[in-house]
């Protein structure tokens, strides 16, 4: 743990989507024989990034959705299933940086949980950065560059191909009290972020290792977008074990209900 850390949660716009993508819970998303015409559960899917002002460096966790989402996602069809239809000018990550008084190159570390379209969407802000270290997991890097063409599933190469990416393997402490956790399953190399704060205690930002409180359980409930279900369930239990050991606050990847209750920029956790 390190004294003097400030952690800011930054909403970066809300998509809407069929909840089935995020939660395979029959009573919430599926028809049954008594209700065969049940409509889709069209749900809010908020996104967020995190800024950590640490005595030893400035950190951004994830890069949100891109401003040009409709055009960028056009070749993939993702814009039809995940429209970014609830966002204001101040929410885009480049706007958030200005609110913090920073340019992209002022940031010491950009930590990318994984390289999906809604987590690396504005990572291009760092394509010309000479100071910032941009980190993802080795498994995510290998997978994200393993295919030919514009996209594969929710990976869109335009988001990350211009970046100078450095990779990590295993759980890695980036700065004192700030640790990347390997939590694969959602993608090849999804990571979560553990931050040990002097006053607020430990916080674990799960990204898409755990979408929602309902995903976490127990028991854990899977989702429509999962690359490896066995690894995904193992990652949920890894997070649960760490959370129980450290009495951590677990912050889910896309929970609107939880996000509404969290402190948000300009307020912070310390």
Predicted regions: what is each one?
Residues 1-118, 133-182, 201-207, 227-247, ...:
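Metallo-beta-lactamase
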Residues 6-9, 49-53, 59, 170-198:
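Core dinuclear metal-dependent hydrolase active-site scaffold
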Residues 12-13, 63-66, 115, 139-140, ...:
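Active-site metal-binding loops of divalent metal-dependent hydrolases
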Residues 16, 67-69, 142, 211-213, ...:
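Feature marks short, surface-exposed loop/turn motifs that line or immediately flank catalytic pockets
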Residues 81-95, 199-270:
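Cap/insert and terminal regions of metallo-dependent hydrolase folds
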Residues 126-130:
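Short, conserved loop/helix-junction motifs that constitute active-site signature segments
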